Amino acid sequence: MLHEALMLEIYRQALNAGALPTARPRSTESANSSERCPSHDSNSSEHGGGAGSGGVGHRLDAAALSTGVMPGEGPTTLHSSFPAVPQSLPSQPPSMEAYLHMVAAAAQQYGFPLAAAAAAGAGPRLPLPLANEAAAPFKLPPQASPTASSNNSEALDFRTNLYGRAESAEPPASEGEEEEFDDGANNPLDLSVGTRKRGHESEPQLGHIQVKKMFKSDSPPANSVASPSASQLLPGVNPYLAAVAAANIFRAGQFPDWNSKNDLVVDPLEKMSDIVKGGASGMGTKEKMHSSKATTPQAASQPPKSPVQPTPNQNSESGGGSGGGAAGSGAVTKARHNIWQSHWQNKGVASSVFRCVWCKQSFPTLEALTTHMKDSKHCGVNVPPFGNLPSNNPQPQHHHPTPPPPPQNHNLRKHSSGSASNHSPSANVKNAFQYRGDPPTPLPRKLVRGQNVWLGKGVEQAMQILKCMRCGESFRSLGEMTKHMQETQHYTNILSQEQSISIKSGNANANSDAKESHNSLSSEESRTLSAVLTCKVCDKAFNSLGDLSNHMAKNNHYAEPLLQSAGARKRPAPKKREKSLPVRKLLEMKGGSGTTQEDHSNEKTSVQGKPGLGPGGGDKNDAALFAERMRQYITGVKAPEEIAKVAAAQLLAKNKSPELVEQKNGGSAKAAGASSVLSAIEQMFTTSFDTPPRHASLPASSPSNSSTKNTSPVASSILKRLGIDETVDYNKPLIDTNDPYYQHYRYTSSERSGSECSAEARPRLDAPTPEKQQQGGGHDEESSKPAIKQEREAESKPVKMEIKSEFVDEPNEAEETSKMEAAVVNGSATNNNNNIVERSSPKTPSSAASPQTRLLPPRSPAESQRSVTPKSPASSHKSYDGSSEGTKKFPSDSLNALSSMFDSLGSSGAGANSRAKLAAAAAAGGSESPENLTAGGNSLAALRQFCVKKEKTA
């Protein structure tokens, strides 16, 4: 740290100092000269041969030359050989001043009179800070006389001219003495202590150890032995400044004897170009360096100029030795010059430099490497992610460096490895991607930041992304994947994860037949998939979603569970609230326990075809089945035998019910009603609504418990009857109030009563013609026998599912038939007209209508009511006698309301206009009836009012 601090201080003072009257270096020439800043390799290679017995002498020569003194001459001939540098040179920059002062101090130490000239020229303007003895940066051993180097000038040629020195490869004779002399602490200080480290050569030549020690020795041991005089005289200097100064001084033509032979110093760029050219002299850089570390023939043939000619190289040595020379710092300067230059120059043989990073093949020249990279596509981004091809490849790429001969024969190596690289690698790389599963080889060492992107480390991730989801094949680029998709059509079925799992499991068992493969999928995944991919209609499992979809589309199995669950959602609402289970499971537990799949399908078809959720009009078995189902959903789970008994009891108790008053007046009406679907529904609901909770909460003397019941909320009353806890958040009524048809009737009866009443009743009230009045009277007086006969006729007709013509044609025919009946039946008693009309008035139009109407009988009595009531003239009279008769009809009103309610709930096929007309008719007479006033917006009250109007019409 002290050493660095001293160097920084020297540099700071050098910058602040004034300019000496020294010659300014020709910066352009020095900058353009090719011998700039020899590298560490060149220095180390040349120093090995030049460390002879005159080592101390050559260091003194270096010191003398760095100060401008010729080593062969004494102090007396200093100024005669060449003028003093400080006096003759113009002013220098502060860095040059610092260096010159340092050189002058070194000259003073060894008795050269240059210090006086420097002092005379520069004066005491630049005070030199004196370092303490422990940190003296420079150590010039004074063991030898200054004239010692003139005898060994050839051995002291440290020029970096590699080509010139290559011819004379004989080391000096007195290397052993110099090794002993310069070994240890007497080595000069390495000024490049803070710069990047150099890798040692594997087998250094003789004398090479000394040079390495000189450049790599630690500074504290060298400084500790420094003499006080040396430490006081030699300050620390920035090695960069010293190198620049020395190079500028000694290469800028300051010495007339130096004839500016630029080839003495090898420029790194020149070295690079020589390596690239691949010449024999340039390719043997390191080998010739190590084998021929001796003086150049130029120095040997010109002994008179030897004191001057080694100056650039001895200047380099003195820079390393005395701390201000160019070579020790010159290596540093060139290392800073370009990282790649030092990297290539430290590589050794060119074959180790030109190496393919992918196939690890070496090449003698850059041209061979470039050709190899072009042929084998081993360049950068497009490189395969796995450099090592599989072992079954006959000639793997990473074995290419082995076949060529040893690297001494560069031409043979060039041809052999070049040919091997030009043919086999390119052939092998074409098949590289057939082995995508091989583990990746380690990528080359990281040279620059972000090289992973270039060198293909991201290719592996890209291949994981660019993977066909069907066959799992990876691709290098999106284009290849697109081509694969187009060729294989693997994009047609975009598969989910489950589907891909099922496909893989199916492919694994593709050899066995379909059933065996399905049964053999024993993994947990396959079992789960089989459970999921099961047809809900036929309970058949499939391997893939595609098979299940094809099966459902082919067999139409997707419609059945949907419709069945849709019907189940409407009917077993209280049961679902009790259990809070899926509809299908509840159907299987309760309703489907005693029935087969055919029963469900029959029930489905009946639900589809009939508006009353019931089966056909003449089918007694379906009527009983439907009554059983409805009873079972409301009252709870019962055994099939119990359900049958309850259905029979309902059918028998219908004539005993106090609310079916019309059965007392017509004996045959009982038989007709017993066979109808509506009778079962009415009986079921009358019994359920006559439960003790209703009688306990309502007065028994009430004319109609069903109507007054509706003053309380529908949900709470029905839930109480069913015994369901109201604290549970199942506040839906028995009839699903969310049903669209139910909402329709509810809102039209309560909210649209005024407008609908005026719209529907106005045309009927405008012209109460005698014919209409006569019809009203006829309905009041008609007997029950014709009605019963007509009902039987209608129920014996075959069931038709069509609805369209019924609403289009039947109203007009209904008016005609009602008029005919009014004319025929005229003087009958009116005491039981209410109950008769409930049965007869609905059936009258359909029985007496045209043959087309007979082919399309209503699905239930309430259906005929719906079709007739909006258009029937008899309905216009409900406003006249509705107020007086409204209190008498409550028992049958509730039955009519419930039957029409179920009729409306099931009539998905009845058009919106028919429902609107029905609701309008219900609202027309709703305002006059007391039920509407008491019930308000209650849904059941609205439905009851609708049936009350039918009875009022009579």
From Swiss-Prot:
Q: Which organism is this protein's natural source?
A: Drosophila melanogaster
Output the lineage of the source organism. Answer: Eukaryota, Metazoa, Ecdysozoa, Arthropoda, Hexapoda
Q: Where is the composition biased (Low complexity)?
A: 417-428, 696-712, 842-851, 910-926
Q: Name one GO cellular component term.
A: cytoplasm
General remark: The tsh tio gene pair seems to have arisen from a recent duplication event: tsh has the dominant role compared to tio.
Give the function comment from the record: Homeotic protein that acts downstream of Arm in the Wg cascade during embryogenesis to determine segment identity throughout the entire trunk. Acts cooperatively with other trunk homeotic proteins to repress head homeotic genes and therefore repress head segmental identity. Necessary, in combination with Scr, for the formation of the prothoracic segment. Promotes eye development in the dorsal region of the eye disk and suppresses eye development in the ventral region in combination with Wg-signaling and several early dorso-ventral eye patterning genes.
Name this protein carries in UniProt: Protein teashirt
Give the compositionally biased regions (Basic residues): 568-578
Please give the residue positions where the record annotates the modification Phosphoserine: 750, 758
